Amino acid sequence: DRFAADTDVFIRQVFERHQKALLGYAGDFRCHSRHLLNKRSFLFGGHHTALDGNIRHILSNIFLEYKDSQNSLLLSFFRIFASFSPNIVMSPVAVIITVLGYILLLFVFARISSRKAGNAAFFTGNRRTPWYMAASAMIAAAMSGVTFISVPGSVAADAFSYMQMVMGFTVGQFIIAFVLVPTFYRLRVVSLYEYLDTRFGITSHRTGAWFFFISKMSGTALKVYIVCAVMQGLVFNHYGIPFWANAALTMTFVWLYTQRGGVKTLIWTDTLKTVCLVASLVLTIVYLMRGMGWSLADTVQQVAASPMSRIFFFDDPASGYYFWKMFSAGIVLLVAMTGLDQDMMQRNLSCATPRDSQKNIILTAFCQIFVILLFLVLGVLLYRYVESTGLPMPAKSDQVFAQVAVNGGLPLAVGVLFVIGLISSIYSSAGSALTALTTSFTVDILTATKHDNDQALTRTRRIVHIAMAACMAVVILGFEYCADDSVINLVYKVAGYTYGPILGMFVFGMSTRRRIKDRWMPLVAIAAPLLSGLLQYVARTHWHYQIGFELLIYNAAFTMLGMLLLTKKKDEK
């Protein structure tokens, strides 16, 4: 309908731009113009508009230009239709085509990278990954669908305070590179939690693995659920497809592209995802700048002048935004949730040598600063765009990006880029987590690598991989059918609490030579998060002090205190 309203303007603008070219119009391209016009109503949901010969000539000429530009077919296709009108709203079919195009490309990468892939390739990538490829893959690994949706939307309430934590992340990356990586390479571990077996015993080993399982399964399922909910609104509700089919389809695709190559496949597909995610981010910023008529200098000036761009908070030590709180929490969070997380470290440990792994981690640290800063800048631009255009402000900050991308009157390319960025981030997160869960369950809980031959190990690994995908789909459905924000927030908190005992166990093991009564370790690991939650409640209600991300530090400290109480005497075996 909007296409019809814009027809006269479209004719004048494009005819003037292509007047000379139209004089030399080649009749061979008439079939292309007719094909595009017939498909237009299918893609954008409007009624078919009868257009005269002039527009057919114009569209044919545009098609010729894009055909000769050597762009991908999918990109050219959307660029042609985006040029019809700057106000076309992205339809469900356009979303579907974008998603299917990306998934097709993903499967091509997965197929190529998983050739001759065995168990070693699945678990460790054969330890042959070039360090720069591992670094590019880690950028995608660090960004989930939640990052893509929530970080830009958070700037209205939190400003750029997240950058304080990112500074802590950078310090944490150096700790991982020069403390943890040499230890893991020296022990030649497949799963990180094998260290706990070597240091304390099998019970501590399985305790660490089970806590990782709970955290990763619930945390990743929640991230996938959030993106599935967005896709449900964009596509599936339009066709009456239930949410369970959405979740099942998503996890089936994730299982299919990771089931052969594992880590070896992840490295290459995550590199593709990094390119898609960063390109989507940068190009969306460019389109927003153009939409508001800003140059690069104008954009820098506007962002710097905005109160939403404040980074440092030194004024209130009791605030959750206080610099030293967020900086120290960033260090601890990064070490615990990256350095002691099988999901994140499996890429780092796929490099051939510790030195290569260290180079990869340091490069990732500096790239991460740049990418997160761009997400925050995007957030400021989104809010300014909503203000300048009079778009209705969504009830939740998480919906701002989707609102502007899909309904903001920007070129269709912005909607396409939003969907590509969203899908690439969630497939990276889910595929990586599924591989890590399969590795940890097979190696740590079933201990299949110790007693199975290669053929039996392959069979076990494949069964576990299917089971992990099915389990994650069930958890995603659980989030949908409970549909309670308080339950979802509780799951996020529980997932965060589980990293405290893991951090405490590793720090205790690496900083002391004490042996513990291994069989009691599960009790300590359960008690520490409970005590941390109690401390947080008392601090808030009685001391009027808000414990934020630094709760992880207290959690780890309680774990270490419990392990100290379990220390064996010198004459005790």
Task: Show the residue positions of the predicted features.
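Compositionally biased, low-complexity peptide segments typical
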Residues: 40, 52-65
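Hydrophobic residues within membrane-embedded alpha helices
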Residues: 1, 15, 20, 43-44, ...
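Membrane-embedded helix-loop-helix hairpins and adjacent transmembrane boundary segments
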Residues: 80, 89-573
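Short, Lys/Arg-enriched N-terminal segments with co-localized hydrophobic residues
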Residues: 63-89
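Intrinsic disorder/low-complexity segments enriched in polar/small residues
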Residues: 14-21, 39-40, 66-71, 571-573
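Compositionally biased, low-complexity intrinsically disordered regions
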Residues: 4-9, 50-53, 57, 75, ...
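Intrinsic low-complexity, disordered N-terminal segments enriched in polar/charged/small residues
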Residues: 4-6, 14, 23-36, 45-52, ...
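Basic polycationic patches enriched in arginine
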Residues: 2, 12, 17, 30-34, ...
